[in-house]
Amino acid sequence: MPITANTLYRDSFNFLRNQIAAILLLALLTAFITVMLNQTFMPASEQLSILSIPENDITSSGNLSISEIVSQMTPEQQMVLLRVSAVATFSALVGNVLLVGGLLTLIAMVSQGRRVSALQAIGLSLPILPRLLVLMFISTLVIQLGLTFFIVPGVAIAIALSLSPIIVTNERMGIFAAMKASAQLAFANVRLIVPAMMLWIAVKLLLLFLISRFTVLPPTIATIVLSTLSNLASALLLVYLFRLYMLLRPVSLDKQ
C-alpha cells in the first residue's frame, strides 16, 4: 500500500491532538531555555550599541552585501557581532536539541503504551542528547554554509538531513552513517518530504516576520510566545517525519 501525504498529515495531527499537553509544555520549556540562554550570554547593551548604524550610513550601505558591510566594520564591532551570532546560534542549538530529543523520546514512549510528561521525556532523552548535539551542530553548520552560497543548496541539504535525528536516535548508526541514510531516504521520497518542509519554512518565516510587530507583550514574553509557536511547528514536522520513517524503515532495513 503506497504511503500518501494525507495519511501522514492525519496521523501527525491525531498524535499532536492526543499529546497536546505534553508537546505544548515541551515547546514552552525549550523556548524558555533558548530565550534565557540568549539573554544570559548576550553582550551588554553598551556593547550592542556600537553595532548601530548612523542614519546617514543606512542609505549608503543599502546596496552592499552582508560580507561587504562586515568588512567595513571596526575590529571591535566585528567581535561584538561575532559574539552575538555565536550566542544566538548556541541558544537555538541547545533549545532545538532538547526539543528534538524530548519529542523523539515522547513519541517512542507513547508508541510503547507508556505515558510520560514533558519533563520525563527530556530526562529520558539525556543519553541520546550528546549524539543529537553533535549531529545537529554539523547539520546546522552545513545548512548555513549552503544558504550562504545560495538558498537552493541550503534547502536541499536541509531536506537531505531531515530524517537524520530520527535515524541516529532509533538505529545503532554513527552520525555520518545516519546522515547518509537520511539523504538516501529523503531524496527517494521527495514528494512526501518537500511539501511538509516548505510549509514548515513558511510558518517559520511568518513567525519571524511577526516578531518585530508583536508589541502587545513585553519583548521577552513575546519572544517566548513566538518561539513556542515555532517549536510547535517543528514538533508537528518531526512527528510527520517520524511517522514517515517508521513506514519506510522496513524497506530501508531490507536494502541495507
UniProtKB/Swiss-Prot annotation:
Pfam families for this protein: UPF0259 (PF06790)
Superkingdom of the source species: Bacteria
GO cellular component: plasma membrane
Keywords assigned: Cell inner membrane, Cell membrane, Membrane, Transmembrane, Transmembrane helix
Name under which the protein is recorded: UPF0259 membrane protein YPO2199/y2042/YP_1997
Lineage: Bacteria, Pseudomonadati, Pseudomonadota, Gammaproteobacteria, Enterobacterales
Membrane topology: Multi-pass membrane protein
Chain segments annotated as transmembrane: 20-40, 90-110, 118-138, 141-161, 192-212, 221-241
Cellular localization per UniProt: Cell inner membrane
Entry keyword annotation includes Transmembrane: yes
Protein family according to the UniProt entry: Belongs to the UPF0259 family.
The keyword Lyase belongs to this UniProt entry's keyword annotation: no
NCBIfam families per UniProt: PRK02868.1 (NF002774)
